[in-house]
Amino acid sequence: MAPPIITAMGLQAIAVALLALLGAAQSGPTPLQRFLARGDEPPVEYRALRRLEANNPKFNQSAWMTAWTEFDRVNGFRFTVAAEGGSGYIRSKVLHAALEGEQKIWANREPDRASFTDDNYTFDAGEQSADGLASVIVKPRRKDVLLGDGSIFVRASDGDLARIEGRLSKTPSFWTRRVDVVRRYQRIAGVRVPVSIESVAHILVAGRSTFKMTYEYETINGQHVGTPQPNASTVLLP
């Protein structure tokens, strides 16, 4: 018969091991594992009113635009300007160009280049953010204007994407030194959709320039979810 103290120590070790296994079982998947398990959701068909704003403090130039934007699998992405104002140069080169660039991306079937997959990124668990979201550090596998180097923030409970913060891994032009981007998401009618994009670009000669775009949804996947209206104070320009 084993000495009582050895038996007690053996039982204690078994108990500790069982508790550790129980704890591991109860802890379940990590936020990173939950996020990766979700995979990319299919493209969302929608109609939304967007407001775009851009500003360059160095030259004291700014502009804004509201536009109806739509996407469906048959007709792709399209937009109609509802109203706009401010610098004609910024409206043309930044605001209109942003929507035209998005239209081109969809027309060329390029969204897969930007998706959060192992083909595009490496993933590492990060720290919990101040707002309670779990962070995931993402590193692009190649330099691409559609890929960011930074962090994504997900709900710890289910891995659902809430925010992206990072720097474009490749700048869109020689004149642009770097672009920092924050993109926020919400679930509306059970569907994850972007609700805002903010960016700060550092440009040779022009210096620091800011861009912001917000979304108000009218329909998502055929379901009416809101009644957005262009600002009544805006004036439609030719």
Q: How would you describe each model-predicted region?
A:
Residues 12, 16-29:
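Bacterial Sec-dependent signal peptides at the C-terminal "C-region" and cleavage site
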